[in-house]
Amino acid sequence: MIKVPRFICMIALTSGILASGLSQSVSAHTEKSEPSSTYHFHSDPLLYLAPPPTSGSPLQAHDDQTFNSTRQLKGSTRWALATQDADLHLASVLKDYACAAGMNLDIAQLPHLANLIKRALRTEYDDIGRAKNNWNRKRPFVDTDQPICTEKDREGLGKQGSYPSGHTTIGWSVALILAELIPDHAANILQRGQIFGTSRIVCGAHWFSDVQAGYIMASGEIAALHGDADFRRDMELARKELEKARTSAHTPDDLLCKIEQSAR
């Protein structure tokens, strides 16, 4: 179990890409952006995210300890879940939330939901990239021989900034959207969003503090998007679509749900 300082947990809870590259994950996995494919409201993470921990600080010591201790999870069921969570294709991300939502989330059957999430993530793209480039933090596995759950992406990830975690920003953004759309499953959805972020720590792709910043950034982005009339309209369309789909949706795979529950 990953030990989390209580005050950091509270920040993440109250505040609330990148297996082969941020640009590839967002643009390729959500199709090419067009002027009308994003929303107009977004937040500036450089104004509200604290800088990453400095070398020799207690927070960096906690980051180091967490990274080293979680390397022991290689080969475990939790490691496999972290590998699964690294896939940012929209169909895969929504599948990750199926158990928590109590229904399969098939993008082919939920076009309004798919459009909503694609536009939201495209809107976040520049903010995530700007924050990463601003701090250009080295990832925890760089200059080590420690394993990560997506070894094929090791070289590419090592060239990208670690802070904040783009995967976590995306995962928590999706969790916030789904929790609002399916309020009777909100707690489970948010819990799955927290697990999605923790997967980046388990994977070894991010420091603990990168993930905490990702939760905060996602919360800022989604809060700002609510100021966009198009976003609110798309939310309502997705809400009605989900309400209708729930009457005939298939239930998620029971084995997968049990694996996710074991990660809690």
From Swiss-Prot:
GO terms under cellular component: outer membrane-bounded periplasmic space
EC number(s) reported in the record: 3.1.3.2
Catalyzed reactions: a phosphate monoester + H2O = an alcohol + phosphate
Cofactor binding notes: Most active with magnesium.
Keywords: Hydrolase, Magnesium, Periplasm, Signal
Record InterPro entries: Acid_Pase_classA_bac, Acid_Pase_classA_bac_CS, P_Acid_Pase_2/haloperoxi_sf, P_Acid_Pase_2/haloperoxidase
Compartmental location: Periplasm
Entry annotated with the keyword Signal: yes
Gene Ontology molecular function terms on file: acid phosphatase activity
Source taxon at top rank: Bacteria
Disulfide cysteine pairs (residue numbers): none
CDD domains to which the protein is assigned, alphabetical: PAP2_acid_phosphatase
Cofactor (UniProt): Mg(2+); Zn(2+)
Signal peptide range in chain numbering: 1-28
Family statement drawn from the similarity comment of this UniProt entry: Belongs to the class A bacterial acid phosphatase family.
Protein name: Acid phosphatase
